[in-house]
Amino acid sequence: MSNLFFVILLAVGFGVWKVLDYFQLPNTFSILLLILTALSGVLWCYHRFVVLPKRHRQVARAEQRSGKTLSEEEKAKIEPISEASEFLSSLFPVLAVVFLVRSFLFEPFQIPSGSMESTLRVGDFLVVNKYAYGVKDPIFQNTIIAGEKPQRGDVIVFKAPQQALIRTGLGATRAAFAENLALSSKDNMSGVDYIKRIVGKGGDRVIFDVEQKTLKVVYGKEGKPCEIDCETKAFEYTQNPTNPAFPNELELTEKGDVTHNVLISEYRRYSDLEFFPQEGMQTAEWLVPEGQYFVMGDHRDHSDDSRFWGFVPEKNIVGKATYIWMSLEKEANEWPTGFRFERFFTAIK
């Protein structure tokens, strides 16, 4: 029976992995981890409540018949247990803890690209707080326990909307895709994790100055666009000394809802066709729908973000990036060459 569970565990795990990989479903790892945890849990229960009691009874009978205490080697020959299945069942407590922590508390995340430099660098390993905005189920991302709402300036990890994955620089194409998707599907969620900073939330009007590359946000009221007595936040910028890590970029301190550094490429120019168009709004202006968020990367001219593909539904948000626990000295798509010890255990601002 134990060997049968072992075969079932391997077969189901492999089959589910192939199916999820084929359909490119969101939360693939969470689904697979849940299944493996459940199967190992069944195997653990079978060992704990069926196999071991039966073995103890057989050993007791054998000792009673022989009139002596059996050695461990002699006991092992009575009702032998498959080492493979015993090992897999022993993984259940570990898998259960990993599943619970990763699903509801914290999840590790690695920075694969430079879209958030210089705040986050390629090779940084982060801890993402998954209960900062409430507790969600790990499969469908439905809220189980409500928490605080994401705020402007928060650095968040989220499931990229489908239109963000279209390999094009034309915002109009992505907008058309997003509209068609909205008509055919309730959810707009891919299996790809992005990390960006929230610039605007529901009701906010975000204005990006294409020439100066500066931001202005007209705050909404309770998720709705403001009509009168509106509060407007014009972000302030001061230039920093040249950062040796980014000698070809201009590093600025941006003072908005939070104060942090951004990188600008002086020679990057934008075309109106690049931006995500919104009906009734001028180019490079967006009115954030209620329950959604406008996000941008801190590496402003090397970030594929809401300016080009639109908004992030609240349901897509995985959690809040809180701190860097380790950092490797590396570039994108290259092997690491060392450690950035000065970045270990630093808070993300």
From Swiss-Prot:
Signal sequence annotation: none
Reaction catalysed by this enzyme: Cleavage of hydrophobic, N-terminal signal or leader sequences from secreted and periplasmic proteins
GO cellular component, one term: plasma membrane
Residues exposed to the Periplasmic side: 102-349
UniProt keyword annotation of Nucleotide-binding present: no
Pfam families referenced in this protein's UniProt entry, alphabetically: Peptidase_S26
GO molecular function (one): serine-type endopeptidase activity
Broad class of where this protein is predominantly found: membrane
CDD domains, alphabetized: S26_SPase_I (cd06530)
Keywords: Cell inner membrane, Cell membrane, Hydrolase, Membrane, Protease, Transmembrane, Transmembrane helix
GO BP, one annotated term: signal peptide processing
Assigned protein family: Belongs to the peptidase S26 family.
Protein name stated in the entry: Signal peptidase I
Organism of derivation: Haemophilus influenzae (strain ATCC 51907 / DSM 11121 / KW20 / Rd)
Gene name per UniProt: lepB
